[in-house]
Amino acid sequence: MWRLSGNWCGANWLCRRCDAALGLWRVFIVIVCVLGVVPAWAGDGADQTVSAPDFAVIEIKLTPTHQRAPISFTVKVAETERQRRHGLMFVSHLPERHGMLFVFESEAPRQFWMKNTQIPLDMLFFDSAGRLVNMIHAAVPFSLTRRNSNGSARYVLELNGGEAAKFDVQSDARLLLPLASQ
């Protein structure tokens, strides 16, 4: 239709309706633009790096078998729910003899997964006395498969994938913690 008298409809009696409709279209376009930009900017959070909580760093000892001397490891301690939930997510490199120690208030069956974890990990589950309950070798990065303790565990030690085999960790392995960490 030709635009007459500055109105889309061409009739003076529709002026107010046309102006109102154009105003609503402008508001609609602004809303669509904002809603289209915000999700692209915010994302769904799945691929975004979550700020890591602060972790205490301690030295622990692991006796791979009763016949061997203890081996020292430098570990970050995850003892709060937030720390345990974050764990080693988004870590792209873990130096040799470094890891994370998950500390729980009491023994219970434990499940871990590798969500947002970029490196393979060995998971060693220990009871309150530091005895090995179960060991998972080289858990696959990013896997949502649940890794079970297969018994009650109070501590879980995560190391680089392959380190448990490298240091010949056996079923009689013991975790030795500093007194303040127990």
Locate the predicted segments by residue.
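N-terminal secretory signal peptides that target proteins for export/translocation
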Residues: 1-20
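Intrinsically disordered/low-complexity terminal segments and short unstructured peptides
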Residues: 6, 30, 62-64
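Bacterial N-terminal signal peptides
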Residues: 25-37
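Compact, glycine-rich, soluble single-domain proteins
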Residues: 43-182
